[in-house]
Amino acid sequence: MNQLEMKKVAAKAALQFVKPDMIVGVGSGSTVNCFIEELGAFRDQIKGAVAASKASEELLRKQGIEVFSANDVSSLDIYVDGADEINPQKMMIKGGGAALTREKIVSSLAKNFICIVDSSKQVDILGSTFPLPVEVIPMARSQVARKLVALGGSPEWREGVITDNGNVILDVHNFIIMNPIEMEKELNNVAGVVTNGIFALNAAHTVIVGTPDGAKIIE
């Protein structure tokens, strides 16, 4: 079973959490795209969805699912998203698709944050396999990069990428994140940082791992 097939296994398993009349929160990325395709079969049973990226909004509309703004809802029953890395405490690195800020906003509305991944995304320590994305106000890019170097990282500007919020992304290599909560707080306090891709303060509640043997659900 290849990686895409394992993503589809996880995406299909997440459908069991979708109930009638829900507004479903969805993130962004390749695994979420699989979920949105599956969610299309529920278009007449759910009220709609709140998406964390413009790309996901477009896919939802193609499936005939009504799209709501985060400002339209006070809470969500579920939020379904992928991750670039996830540790045993259900803390994640996200932001490979540059939608990390909106993902934090929408996921914070959810009673149940469901993370769907294939088994390659599971790590013991965050930062082991994937650089940490940091969304930065454009005028602060160099200043923030210097601060990240001082903290022990090796930031790389993701040239040509502009977020849905009009900002830029620095991908920080060589961060081995032993204390994700403290690191998330520290980086978010750097002037010019909008947010960083550590999801530790708002970790997942449920993890669904797609494996060759089927979906493994961790609650």
From Swiss-Prot:
<dbReference type="InterPro" id="IPR004788">
    <property type="entry name" value="Ribose5P_isomerase_type_A"/>
</dbReference>
<keyword id="KW-0413">Isomerase</keyword>
<feature type="binding site">
    <location>
        <position position="121"/>
    </location>
    <ligand>
        <name>substrate</name>
    </ligand>
</feature>
<dbReference type="GO" id="GO:0005829">
    <property type="term" value="C:cytosol"/>
</dbReference>
<feature type="binding site">
    <location>
        <begin position="94"/>
        <end position="97"/>
    </location>
    <ligand>
        <name>substrate</name>
    </ligand>
</feature>
<dbReference type="InterPro" id="IPR020672">
    <property type="entry name" value="Ribose5P_isomerase_typA_subgr"/>
</dbReference>
<comment type="pathway">
    <text>Carbohydrate degradation; pentose phosphate pathway; D-ribose 5-phosphate from D-ribulose 5-phosphate (non-oxidative stage): step 1/1.</text>
</comment>
<comment type="subunit">
    <text>Homodimer.</text>
</comment>
<feature type="binding site">
    <location>
        <begin position="28"/>
        <end position="31"/>
    </location>
    <ligand>
        <name>substrate</name>
    </ligand>
</feature>
<feature type="binding site">
    <location>
        <begin position="81"/>
        <end position="84"/>
    </location>
    <ligand>
        <name>substrate</name>
    </ligand>
</feature>
<comment type="similarity">
    <text>Belongs to the ribose 5-phosphate isomerase family.</text>
</comment>
<dbReference type="GO" id="GO:0006014">
    <property type="term" value="P:D-ribose metabolic process"/>
</dbReference>
<dbReference type="GO" id="GO:0004751">
    <property type="term" value="F:ribose-5-phosphate isomerase activity"/>
</dbReference>
<comment type="function">
    <text>Catalyzes the reversible conversion of ribose-5-phosphate to ribulose 5-phosphate.</text>
</comment>
<dbReference type="InterPro" id="IPR037171">
    <property type="entry name" value="NagB/RpiA_transferase-like"/>
</dbReference>
<dbReference type="Pfam" id="PF06026">
    <property type="entry name" value="Rib_5-P_isom_A"/>
</dbReference>
<feature type="active site" description="Proton acceptor">
    <location>
        <position position="103"/>
    </location>
</feature>
<dbReference type="GO" id="GO:0009052">
    <property type="term" value="P:pentose-phosphate shunt, non-oxidative branch"/>
</dbReference>
<protein>
    <recommendedName>
        <fullName>Ribose-5-phosphate isomerase A</fullName>
        <ecNumber>5.3.1.6</ecNumber>
    </recommendedName>
</protein>
